[in-house]
Regions:
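Cysteine endopeptidase catalytic domains of the caspase/legumain-like
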Residues: 1-235
Length: 235
């Protein structure tokens, strides 16, 4: 939700954003602040004015493939209708395991499956550049399968052999509010939306404890010192 709000604040409308989420926090019976989701104790309500396109429990890998295909149908009215000149920011936060990334409670998406989706997009010239940020345990395994795709850069919270750690325990609610990987990236982007990809990686790497933030496919993307996040956050 923090990325969603950041994009909205950068000038993007809901027509430019596809939001897939579990949507089980704001109105949860155990949430002391009904309708409120925060990343920090005194942070803004990230659920404010949110438009959810798909609930996670309704999404399988096949649904994901349709959404990324750019071809809408009755069941998938909102799709990634991007073209050769578009830069795509893709954020995925979920559980992960060596075999792949969790999609809801029962589906598991492997690295080979994600590579098929993204390679097809590349073959059809449906993005200029894509930045895929993955917050999940063992996320490096999926990213490694996607190497070789032109214009794609993947940054993961952990390599292929380790878990990713939660951060900021809030005792009154008995819950972790965020992940150090994400909080490091978000803080940097708020302070410098035009930060270079190299600097963003360094901030995430040094700010993340318990796992190794890793970049994949840089050789097929471009110069990380010269390329910046302004390409994804500037409308």
């Amino acid at each position: 939700l923090e990325y969603y709000q950041m994009l909205r604040n950068s000038g993007y409308s809901d027509d430019d954003i596809i939001l897939i989420m579990a949507d089980d926090l704001a109105q949860n019976a155990n949430n002391p602040e009904k309708g409120v989701v925060r990343r920090s104790v005194d942070g803004d309500n990230l659920y404010k004015n949110v438009v959810v396109d798909y609930r996670l429990e309704d999404i399988t890998y096949n649904d994901l493939a349709v959404i990324f295909s750019g071809k809408p149908d009755v069941a998938h009215p909102e799709v990634l209708d991007s073209g050769a000149g578009d830069n795509v920011l893709f954020f995925w936060s979920s559980h992960g395991m060596p075999a792949g990334l969790a999609l809801g409670d029962i589906d598991l998406v492997s690295g080979k499956q994600m590579a098929r989706i993204l390679q097809k997009m590349s073959d059809e010239q449906r993005f200029r550049k894509m930045m895929w940020i993955v917050e999940a345990c063992y996320s490096g395994g999926v990213a490694k399968e996607c190497e070789g795709i032109p214009g794609l850069l993947v940054m993961t919270a952990a390599n292929a052999n380790e878990s990713s750690k939660a951060d900021l325990w809030y005792a009154p609610y008995n819950v972790y509010l965020t992940n150090r990987f994400t909080s490091s990236i978000i803080s940097r982007l708020y302070s410098d939306p035009a930060t270079s990809l190299r600097d963003l990686y360094n901030v995430a790497f040094t700010g993340t404890l318990g796992s190794h933030v890793t970049i994949y496919n840089a050789d097929n993307y471009g110069n990380l010192y010269q390329n910046t996040m302004r390409e994804f956050l500037g409308k």
